[in-house]
Regions:
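Conserved short histidine dyad/triad with adjacent acidic residue
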Residues: 2-22
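Class I (Rossmann-like) S-adenosyl-L-methionine-dependent methyltransferase catalytic domain
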Residues: 14, 83-109, 115, 121-171, ...
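Short, conserved beta-strand element in jelly-roll/cupin
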Residues: 25-35
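A short acidic, Gly/Pro-enriched loop at the edge of an enzyme's catalytic core
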Residues: 171-179
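A short SAM/SAH-binding and catalytic strip from SAM-dependent methyltransferases
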Residues: 178-192
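A short glycine-rich, Lys/Arg-flanked "PGG" loop and its adjoining helix->strand segment in the class I
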Residues: 194-206
């Protein structure tokens, strides 16, 4: 962010506003003084603080209402925004947020080779690479891979990015400690699914993990979207007979896609974290 003076401090910051969900702000004073007002949602002042460069200025919490005003003519200050690692790439590069199942499973993944099968623009690949994993990203969409490559270069992340058709069931690169495929297999030709899953399994190192999230269609909850492939109840679990299931459920979830009323589409998903 730029350095502002008493004259150039943006008008929106002088008025009531708040930080976004998942975003923290920190104010740094280089010279002079600034008045910070804590507000309620109606604009009433809850507290007033005078900050200088000697002040220990706290972070502004997400969605906290506030406003500021110069308290001296020689004011020089700037703002820095912060977020959690799982939100970083989404906020900075306008990507979809890292999948919640990837975030949850990451602490138990062995630090090694990760294959993101159907990576798209890299919402999961970038997060895992930033966490120190050796990531390979495969996807059929060249435009998505190009954006991923640009972000990886800008962030100084070494990600192996390759075009790949999942239906070929011919994963490159030997064995992986982790293979993830989140919200991808529903777009695959259903006749290739047995080969695709067998290929994932055969390229998973002993003790390694497969994390899959995919659409379902069941008698009690037919899939509202015409995906090429939807899993029946228990189908994915059967493919992984003999593996250790650390997580398996067939719960309802939401797509980012919306219906004609603007509501996110609800449907049943199979979520599985299996260890070889």
């Amino acid at each position: 962010m730029p350095t502002w003076t008493a004259e150039t401090l943006p008008e929106p910051f002088r008025k009531m506003h708040n930080t976004k969900v998942g975003t923290w702000a920190h104010l740094t004073i280089l010279e002079g003084a600034l008045t910070f007002y804590e507000l309620d949602e109606n604009g009433n002042v809850l507290a007033q603080h005078l900050f200088t460069k000697e002040s220990e200025i706290p972070f502004v919490e997400p969605q906290a209402w506030h406003r500021v005003s110069p308290a001296s003519d020689d004011l020089k200050c700037y703002l820095t925004f912060y977020c959690t690692p799982e939100d970083y790439f989404a906020k900075k590069y306008d990507l979809t947020r890292t999948h919640s199942e990837v975030i949850e499973a990451t602490p138990i993944f062995p630090k090694g080779k990760v294959l993101d099968l159907g990576s798209g623009e890299g919402r999961n690949s970038l997060y895992l690479a930033k966490k120190g994993f050796d990531v390979t990203s495969l996807d059929i969409n060249s435009m998505s891979l190009a954006k991923l490559a640009q972000i990886a270069e800008a962030e100084g992340l070494d990600i192996n990015i390759q075009p790949y058709n999942i239906e070929s069931a011919d994963i490159p690169g030997g064995l992986y400690d982790v293979i993830i495929s989140t919200v991808v297999l529903m777009f695959v030709d259903p006749y290739t699914i047995p080969d695709v899953i067998e290929n994932m399994q055969s390229h998973t190192a002993p003790g390694g993990f497969n994390l899959i999230v995919a659409a379902m269609s069941t008698e009690d909850a037919p899939c509202p979207v015409n995906f090429p492939k939807t899993f029946a109840s228990g189908e994915l679990k059967d493919y992984y007979a003999g593996w250790t299931l650390h997580k398996y459920n067939e719960d309802f979830g939401q797509l980012h896609k919306t219906d004609e009323n603007g509501n996110r589409i609800k449907m049943r998903f199979v979520t599985m974290l299996a260890q070889k």
